[in-house]
């Protein structure tokens, strides 16, 4: 933080120049209220402390001089004579203020943002004068103004507008960005002469001891304006956010129009302005109008309908007191509902209850039966023949399975089995239990050599019976010869 903001000097009357005194090196003391330029001492220079700020104490008149805030915040008044009011020249000061205001308005207007008021300026402090030791009277230095120092701290001290002169810089030496901050607590409206300036990238600001609180971009003290501080006129200043800052005007966000919300709002207003005259039951689910009066409506499908609006969706027949069918929140009379249903592939009647689908067709559960035993096949395995006739497994095997050449019965799978096992010999089919020797009844096997089949003259014989018959035939042939 740089040194304090010094008030610009003015030319006082020589006869009323205050008497000064020598100050020790490093001591804090204010400049004279009316800017008597002090001659620099060759050995002793005045070095102001960085914590000093110059402002006018609350409740004091303007002619009491300037108030200084020391390191501990206690106001300290400078020793000197009251300011001379004869050298202020109010006419020239007002003209100069108006000229500076118009110049700032033109400059800011060309940059595309709102013009800044004189109270928003951060004045560059002139070089602090040096005190001369001794008890002699202090005389103003007739030389030129000292060169401006480096840019000061962004925490500019409040400066009364009546002290602005032609030698005051028109603007700060560094670029100023006036930001519109959020509403500040504990701070009143901006005063004329108070500077609110922020550097290009200011760091975080914290309250300092003996000073006001730092809020947002500038410095502002918690004090009421004194007699010498002029309040801004209404309409010139406003709360934070009311005027555009260096970042352009703030435009409130506008929500896009919602037609549904607007329609519901208008409907609500219309209903409030036009209440129903009779007994109100609700809004009709068909036409959308109010259902008013006893006996004027019916309740169905969790909605209220006019009697004339509750009709079949297909034939438009009134359904009051009738049985109706609800499909996807639509009402149908019985005949129209039945016409929309699937028909059974066996009896060709509409299926009103459960639908059993098989082979891409719809059936009543009672119509899906075996064509042989007429047993219902709902949940039971079935099969079809070449003509698409439905059979249960047992009847299908009985009807189409091969027959045994011994017993004549159908050769079917064993209980719990799915495959059929049979023995084929001499182009005939046999059950496993029916494959026996025709002479002795020995159970034959297709695997064993001793119990294998030895057919003779179309007969199924075992090995022993086959050999005995061969010998018998041989003996007969020999005898005949």
Swiss-Prot record:
Region (Interaction with MAGI1 and PTPN13): 474-481
Gene Ontology MF term list: interleukin-1 receptor binding; kinase binding; metal ion binding
Compositional bias ranges of the Pro residues kind: 1-12
Description of post-translational modifications: Phosphorylation at Tyr-55 by SRC is required for enhancement of lysophosphatidic acid-induced cell migration. Tyr-55 is dephosphorylated by PTPN13.
Modified residues (Asymmetric dimethylarginine): 25
Record's compositionally biased regions (Basic and acidic residues): 108-122, 221-233
Residues found modified as Omega-N-methylarginine: 25, 111, 185, 192, 211, 243
S-S bridge residues: none
Family as reported in the entry's similarity comment: Belongs to the zyxin/ajuba family.
Protein name: Thyroid receptor-interacting protein 6
